[in-house]
Amino acid sequence: MSFVTEIKTFAALGSGVIGSGWIARALAHGLDVVAWDPAPGAEAALRARVANAWPALRKQGLAPGAAQERLRFVASIEECVGDADFIQESAPERLDLKLDLHARISAAARPDVLIGSSTSGLLPSEFYAEASHPERCLVGHPFNPVYLLPLVEVVGGERTAAEAVRAAMRVYESLGMRPLHVRKEVPGFIADRLLEALWREALHLVNDGVATTGEIDDAIRFGAGLRWSFMGTFLTYTLAGGNAGMRHFMAQFGPALQLPWTYLPAPELTEALIDRVVEGTAEQQGARSIAELERYRDDCLLAVLGAIRETKARHGFAFAE
């Protein structure tokens, strides 16, 4: 079966931080967007988020015809998805909610239209169990801010067609993203599993009084974080092995993985630990508002992405390599 990959109308269900990021990205790529969210005040909040993201998108470069005015907010699921060429759901992470939602979405959508979910914690075989034409249903898990970060993890369920996964990856690429096919259904997929391991270690370091939240963030942003933005973990460690490469690195440093100085279980989230984390991050934030920090983050991301793209091209690499 073939699926629609030429997208003119993008349907978005859920308009919170993630959903609005999808909407802003689709608008910036010159698409018409139809959005639905049953929460009170959702439309006004959505339009404000899109407006806040637009300066960064303008700096990155808008597609011909891209305009915030091409967003239409509707009152029903059926009106949202009925004429859509691609559907992205970004609803709260509740299995019962997603089961019902996708039964309704899939019943109202054309059978050759792909349906993606932004879920980070649920598996597609579970929440697409009652969907019509489940062969076109999958996960497209993005990262915040969705309108700037290119990574999207694409995960198929037990009944997802292989062609649907390939088609979805083409659609996401057309939106300027770097789709990553997750080969097996596994909780947390790829990136969040890595991030959760780091998060657990960070909480232990705060809980044990080893470092403040600011010091831990400094350890990442002035160290490994800079390398990760263009090289990743495995290639970084390959270089650490010198001319002998990864095999030498594994032989030299592999035994250290058995040392008992790292934690795998998360620390107990006591009130004292929560207070310490909240107080530390409040000190880091200072007097800056969340909106100010979002604009700062967006400008930094644009600068980093631009520098990486330019440097890779100079060395003969494509951006996705």
Swiss-Prot record:
It catalyses: carnitine + NAD(+) = 3-dehydrocarnitine + NADH + H(+). Its main location: cytoplasm. Disruption phenotype: Cells are incapable of growth on carnitine. GO terms for molecular function: carnitine 3-dehydrogenase activity; NAD+ binding; oxidoreductase activity. GO terms for biological process: carnitine catabolic process; fatty acid metabolic process. Optimum temperature is 35 degrees Celsius for the reaction in both directions. Optimum pH is 9-9.5 for the forward reaction (oxidation) and 7.0 for the reverse reaction (reduction). Keywords: Cytoplasm, NAD, Oxidoreductase. It is found in: Cytoplasm. It comes from the Bacteria. Induction: Highly induced by carnitine via the CdhR transcriptional regulator. Not induced by glycine betaine or pyruvate. Pathway: Amine and polyamine metabolism; carnitine metabolism. Analogs of L-carnitine such as D-carnitine, glycine betaine and choline, are competitive inhibitors of L-carnitine oxidation. The keyword rRNA processing does not apply. It is an enzyme of class 1 (oxidoreductase). One of its GO terms (cellular component) is cytoplasm. NAD(+) binds at G14, S15, G16, V17, I18, G19. Its EC number is 1.1.1.108. Homodimer. Belongs to the 3-hydroxyacyl-CoA dehydrogenase family. L-carnitine dehydrogenase subfamily. Catalyzes the NAD(+)-dependent oxidation of L-carnitine to 3-dehydrocarnitine. Is specific for L-carnitine and NAD(+) as substrates. D,L-3-hydroxybutyrate, L-lactate, ethanol, L-malate and D,L-isocitrate are not substrates. Is involved in a L-carnitine degradation pathway that allows P.aeruginosa to grow on L-carnitine as the sole source of carbon and nitrogen. This is L-carnitine dehydrogenase. The gene is cdhA.
